[in-house]
Amino acid sequence: MFPYLTRMNLSIKMGGLTLKESSPNAFLNNTTIARRFKHEYAPRFKIVQKKQKGRVPVRTGGSIKGSTLQFGKYGLRLKSEGIRISAQQLKEADNAIMRYVRPLNNGHLWRRLCTNVAVCIKGNETRMGKGKGGFDHWMVRVPTGKILFEINGDDLHEKVAREAFRKAGTKLPGVYEFVSLDSLVRVGLHSFKNPKDDPVKNFYDENAKKPSKKYLNILKSQEPQYKLFRGR
């Protein structure tokens, strides 16, 4: 049915799969199947799992997860209260930043957020009941102090980064601030924290002083008579 498949050579290259035909064939010659390995604001799911509305988390324990720069030199951080941001809003801010990143040498933009909550809506003046509404768009819950974007480049100046993030902030709801590697970590609306001031805790040293039942069981499981009965 497909005689040309026996004469086809497959060669995998970086960034995609290239199909090469030994005989002159206009359809298969130099045909490339593009593969996308980039960040996506709208996941391409065939079946969208509906979510509850939920609330934006309020961090009260001083957590700094996602609030520090991990890849670039400069970043954009949420300063106001936690908000919900849609995928379309993040994409508009992304486009505004990329206008300044593309001319840079080895310029790169890191996107720290992933829109993982499906928003479903129902029409206006709709009666109660009869199930949840249909899928409309993707969104993400962003708590206070969260890093949204990071940029870096060989010839990136701080003024250029500030202007890029300023324009990106106008596309997004909420109030944002410019951060660098020397900036303190925001853990609340009016509180900051320096991660270097936190003492480094060792799990084994702390449990050795006052061992718990769980820690004693871990030590006992390392004895040879118990290793014989593993994987049964």
From Swiss-Prot:
InterPro entries named in the record: Ribosomal_uL16, Ribosomal_uL16_bact-type, Ribosomal_uL16_CS, Ribosomal_uL16_dom, Ribosomal_uL16_sf
Q: Which GO terms describe its biological process?
A: mitochondrial translation
* GO molecular function terms attached to this record: rRNA binding; structural constituent of ribosome
Q: Where is the transit peptide?
A: 1-41
**Location, primary (coarse class):** mitochondrion
Which Gene3D superfamilies does this one have?
Ribosomal protein L10e/L16
Q: Where in the cell is it found?
A: Mitochondrion
Q: What is a single Pfam family found in this protein's UniProt entry?
A: Ribosomal_L16
Q: For this UniProt entry, what's an example GO CC term?
A: mitochondrial inner membrane
- Provide the alphabetized UniProt keywords: Mitochondrion, Ribonucleoprotein, Ribosomal protein, Transit peptide
Q: Add the further remark from the entry.
A: Present with 2900 molecules/cell in log phase SD medium.
Q: Which PANTHER family match?
A: 50S/60S RIBOSOMAL PROTEIN L16 (PTHR12220), LARGE RIBOSOMAL SUBUNIT PROTEIN UL16M (PTHR12220:SF13)
User: Subunit structure, briefly?
Assistant: Component of the mitochondrial large ribosomal subunit (mt-LSU). Mature yeast 74S mitochondrial ribosomes consist of a small (37S) and a large (54S) subunit. The 37S small subunit contains a 15S ribosomal RNA (15S mt-rRNA) and 34 different proteins. The 54S large subunit contains a 21S rRNA (21S mt-rRNA) and 46 different proteins.
The entry's function note states:
Component of the mitochondrial ribosome (mitoribosome), a dedicated translation machinery responsible for the synthesis of mitochondrial genome-encoded proteins, including at least some of the essential transmembrane subunits of the mitochondrial respiratory chain. The mitoribosomes are attached to the mitochondrial inner membrane and translation products are cotranslationally integrated into the membrane.
Protein family per UniProt: Belongs to the universal ribosomal protein uL16 family.
Name listed for the protein in its UniProt record:
Large ribosomal subunit protein uL16m
